[in-house]
Amino acid sequence: MFFAVITLFPEMFDAITAYGISGRAAKRDIVQVTCINPRDFAEGNYRRVDERPFGGGPGMVMMAEPLAKAINHAKQLASRAGCVHVPVVYMSPQGKTLNEQAVQQFVDYDGLIVLCGRYEGVDERLIQHYVDQEWSIGDYVLSGGELPAMVLLDSIIRRLPNVMSDEQSAIQDSFVDGLLDCPQYTKPDQFEGLDVPEILKSGHHANIEKWRFLQRYQRTLERRPELIEQVTLTKQQKKWLSDEQG
């Protein structure tokens, strides 16, 4: 999958391309992550990419022209890589909140061009003409779009085929089917007076699967009750709940 990131700080994305699951995917050429600095497309000796906002106010606004040139360059790179469906995504606190359903849709794309804002944001005309989607990672403000972009890339990359060494791990993550994950345990059997649930050491896989589902359902009900209404249960899961509730 092809990713082009429009950013003033390309070095930050070493965290994606050099480490962990996403780093391994990059080394195996499952993903291609290219960072494009809009300063390379700016005019003048100082290569400015920001200016004061019209109408006054604090801070600076990123200029449309260098960003547009950077995006067009990214589209050319995507085309050379054989990509057809490559939307431009702007990471913005005004965007829709990223969730697992959105991530699953991104996985089906050929690639993404991700625009990282800075300062007070970007010229609205750039958004109107070049941005296909706006996404946020939560109702709070960060110094720039780089960290949200890394969250987006990491969440997509781990869902791509052949990225996870154990693909079942990705399937069982929180939110994949709408429920939170179940409690996880490893050695030792006892830690500060707390024991691993006996059922997890029983070797009875059907009972373990039932226990894990009930734990996930109860945890979601307690911590994120608004998610329960969106969950579609299997026939077996409905039976487990019915048995548990008597």
UniProtKB/Swiss-Prot annotation:
Single GO biological process annotation from the record: tRNA N1-guanine methylation
Amino acids binding S-adenosyl-L-methionine: 117, 137-142
Any Pfam family: tRNA_m1G_MT
Compartments it resides in: Cytoplasm
Enzyme class: transferase
Chief location category: cytoplasm
GO molecular function, one term: tRNA (guanine(37)-N1)-methyltransferase activity
Self-association state and partner proteins as the record states: Homodimer.
Protein name from the UniProt record: tRNA (guanine-N(1)-)-methyltransferase
